[in-house]
Amino acid sequence: MLRSLYSGISGMKNFQTKLDVIGNNIANVNTVGFKKSRVTFKDMVSQTIAGGSAAGATIGGTNSKQIGLGSSSGTIDTIHSTSATQSTGRTLDLAIDGDGYFRIDTGDGTAYTRAGNFYLDNTGTLVTGDGYHVLNMNGGTIKIPTDAQSFSIGSDGKVSIVDAEGKTQDGGQIGIVTFANSDGLDKIGSNLYRESLNSGTASAANQPGDGGTGALKSGFLEMSNVDLTDEFTEMIVAQRGFQSNSKIITTSDEILQELVNLKR
């Protein structure tokens, strides 16, 4: 009887975790470059009531008798599928059409992002919305002269600047990196990732479109890959799973109460 109670508790905890993940996905449905997460479950150890036996001369073999002891969270995965892009017409909005990540200098290390909503600070340096520097192919910053007439960013990441005298200048090139296992990247907030032991180190910066990286699309933003239809469906499943496991606990409690009443 206690086994069913603990199985129900483990199930409720797991579905609560699933609801937490779904809630975060839905909250970020409009977050630029956001990648949704999912939860997988695995069964816990099973108690063997009777072991199996091999077939004999006069009788066949038997299977083991086992009772499971509940479930636990297996993995919480980040799904790095490419999502739809939205046209903005803004030069500093960049989408990666394929694999790869922008390199960002956070001041205390290098981070990576798919969110390409970039800006220029008062010095003309290309930065994220939080003021972190966007790095070029060589690991340096990208600067646009404050008196430049205009600038553009090509699909290969090259920045072309028309200076105050109307001459075209080379403004550097945005580099894109890849990972052996992008699923292993750690989310650190602000649409940023950090490499982990399981993601492997970032590749050398490649020109967008080379080395397995996607080309850049200026004037576009990659949107979240969250699908509300899928999330609401999973939310219903998680809600029913939570309710069903809570029913296991209440039913087991009622049976235990009946056993206690037998003494009266």
Swiss-Prot record:
Keywords: Bacterial flagellum. The keyword Ribonucleoprotein does not apply. It is found in: Bacterial flagellum basal body. This is Flagellar basal-body rod protein FlgG. PANTHER family: FLAGELLAR HOOK PROTEIN FLGE (PTHR30435:SF1), FLAGELLAR PROTEIN (PTHR30435). Belongs to the flagella basal body rod proteins family. Its main location: other. One of its GO terms (cellular component) is cytosol. It comes from the Bacteria. It comes from Bacillus subtilis (strain 168). The basal body constitutes a major portion of the flagellar organelle and consists of four rings (L,P,S, and M) mounted on a central rod. The rod consists of about 26 subunits of FlgG in the distal portion, and FlgB, FlgC and FlgF are thought to build up the proximal portion of the rod with about 6 subunits each. The keyword Protease does not apply. GO terms for biological process: bacterial-type flagellum assembly; bacterial-type flagellum-dependent swarming motility. InterPro entries: Flag_bb_rod_N (IPR001444), Flagellar_basal_body_rod_CS (IPR019776), Flagellar_FlgE/F/G (IPR020013), Flg_bb/hook_C_dom (IPR010930), FlgE/F/G-like (IPR037925), FlgF (IPR012836), LlgE_F_G-like_D1 (IPR053967).
